[in-house]
């Protein structure tokens, strides 16, 4: 399942992460993340996977269903923010 812009924003909000924090965790530039979140660019598959992995390490679980698209599971968090 490919991560969506909505899921990225929702996950960041659940974790109370800034774009700067997520970008650093995913190994990408903050302006790149901003462009992705604002729909100005479509991330390469490797970039989308890096973002997804960074969020999952912090306890985000992504779902295939319509709503909610992700939730926080503290038990799955490898990194606490």
Language-model segments: what does each one mean?
Residues 28-43:
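Recognition helix of helix-turn-helix/homeodomain-like DNA-binding domains
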Residues 6-21:
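Short basic helix-loop element that most often maps to the first helix and adjoining turn
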Residues 27, 46-63:
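DNA major-groove recognition helix of helix-turn-helix/homeodomain DNA-binding modules
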Residues 1-3:
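A detector for short, charged/polar N-terminal pre-domain segments
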Residues 60-81:
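Helix-turn-helix/homeodomain-like alpha-helical modules used for DNA recognition
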Residues 8, 22-23, 33-36:
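Conserved hydrophobic/aromatic packing and binding residues within compact polymer-binding modules
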Residues 13, 24, 56:
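Short polybasic/polar patches that bind polyanions
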